Amino acid sequence: MTLRKRLVLLIYFLFLLVPIYWLLNMSFKSNTEILGGLSLWPQSFTLDNYRVIFTDRSWYEGYLNSLYYVSLNTLISLSVALPAAYAFSRYRFLGDKHLFFWLLTNRMAPPAVFLLPFFQLYSSIGLFDTHIAVALAHCLFNVPLAVWILEGFMSSVPKEIDETAYIDGYSFPKFFVKIFIPLIRSGIGVTAFFCFMFSWVELLLARTLTSVDAKPIAAVMTRTVSASGIDWGVLAAAGVLTIIPGMLVIWFVRNHVAKGFALGRV
């Protein structure tokens, strides 16, 4: 790699890190210091902003609510997408291409299109302000994406493996769990990553379909806006803590994501 390319990468890397550093910097400042002027590091280091989040029930429950419905959504999306993707990759039937395209069109539509139908449906059947409501709503977008990614990985697995397993006496569930899934574990890791991240950062549906009991952290962060202004320090601390789950997920699936870029539909 030439010096020029390294310099460009360094500048790009710094460009990405500056907002994160500034957010972290603000989280250790008081609101007065933040509004007082620019500084590269806190003049009066304080943990009060984080103390507010960890002691205020509405704040830490927002994180727990988000983690709960995001994990639930990822689990449901993978459970539905795995057999569906296997069917699309292994079998040919009338209208399979049209069905696959129709499935993907759900992912292309913006969440606002489905907002009112979801709100009216969940309100009428008693699912409003529940974790499962948000998880199921996000499945409308994550399942098509998961099927698309997994179908690409499954298509790269030779069909002869299926036939050999059946000849050896494997039932389909046993073959699928013990043989096939380990072969596409990279695809599952990539799919879980994208499902998790979409559900974690999505705000419109999560905020509209919840009120109190299942309110996510993204919606809780908006309540820092009040008549007295914005509590920038607490908002910055909440932002830092919101980044951490995504960083942990990326760390655990980093190898699978790299393989996904090389082999799958990523």
Feature-to-residue mapping (PLM):
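A structural signal for multi-pass alpha-helical bundles of membrane permease subunits
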Residues: 5-266
